[in-house]
């Protein structure tokens, strides 16, 4: 039943994103190292919500050479169907504060992160953010720059890159140096948080890679 309920209609819209870039500390606690890493935690926590709902078993977290971070899960994929607001539900999740499945009680009984709220905050505080949603046999794609959508919707829906048998969501983003004091993620803090998350969720596997050095560090929790 829950699988059918988690769709475009599960996204509830409350307000816009304007305040996030002006007062980021209200949403992520600050613009230092902890606030920077908090961007990753928000996306990971959304994937953990999928795990708690019974769908996601693996999360991959990569720190890329260009300073960006990639988070991928094998959950159901963010809803991409047409929302009553006239656009893809994914677009609402990433551009509207407080648009997320968490605010519709039918989709999740438990919720770890801001869920949806977190996605839009990460988007607003990133130089760019790229989304791929694997859902219903297709790879749906979207891209943003400082929170602004860069791709034109086709009849309100996302462009499709191709077909896939996988399900899940892949998000890659580059933190905005106009917002943060520094944009170099702390691998030590991140590894500690991922280890704790995996410990609290025994059936969840988390893969971590730090690709920024000469040799890639790989860990599985």
Regions found by a protein language model. Name each.
Residues 28-31, 35-36, 51, 106-109, ...:
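Short, surface-exposed helix-loop/turn micro-motifs enriched in polar/charged residues
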Residues 19-22, 26, 49, 53, ...:
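Conserved helix-loop functional segments at active or binding sites
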Residues 34-57, 118-125:
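Conserved ATP-binding N-box helix of the HATPase_c
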Residues 14, 22, 65, 165-167:
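A short, polar/charged loop/turn motif at coil->beta-strand junctions and beta-hairpin connectors
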Residues 2-9, 67-89, 100-221:
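GHKL-type ATPase core
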């Amino acid at each position: 039943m829950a699988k059918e309920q988690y769709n475009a209609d599960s996204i509830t819209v409350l307000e816009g994103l304007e305040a996030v870039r002006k007062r980021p500390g209200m949403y992520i606690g600050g613009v230092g190292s902890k606030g920077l890493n908090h961007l990753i935690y928000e996306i990971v926590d959304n994937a953990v919500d999928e795990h708690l709902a019974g769908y996601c078993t693996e999360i991959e977290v990569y720190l890329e050479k260009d300073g960006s971070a990639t988070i991928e899960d094998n959950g159901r994929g963010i809803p991409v169907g047409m929302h009553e607001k006239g656009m893809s539900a994914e677009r609402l999740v990433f551009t509207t504060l407080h648009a997320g499945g968490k605010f519709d009680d039918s989709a999740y009984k438990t919720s770890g992160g801001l869920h949806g709220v977190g996605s839009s905050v990460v988007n607003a505080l990133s130089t760019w953010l790229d989304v791929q949603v694997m859902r219903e046999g297709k790879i749906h794609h979207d891209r943003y720059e400082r929170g602004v959508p860069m791709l034109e919707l086709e009849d309100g829906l996302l462009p499709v890159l191709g077909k896939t048998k996988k399900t899940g969501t892949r998000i890659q983003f580059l933190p905005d140096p106009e917002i943060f004091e520094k944009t170099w993620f702390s691998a030590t803090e991140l590894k500690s948080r991922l280890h704790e998350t995996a410990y609290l969720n025994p059936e969840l596997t988390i893969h971590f890679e730090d690709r920024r050095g000469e040799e890639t560090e790989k860990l599985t929790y």
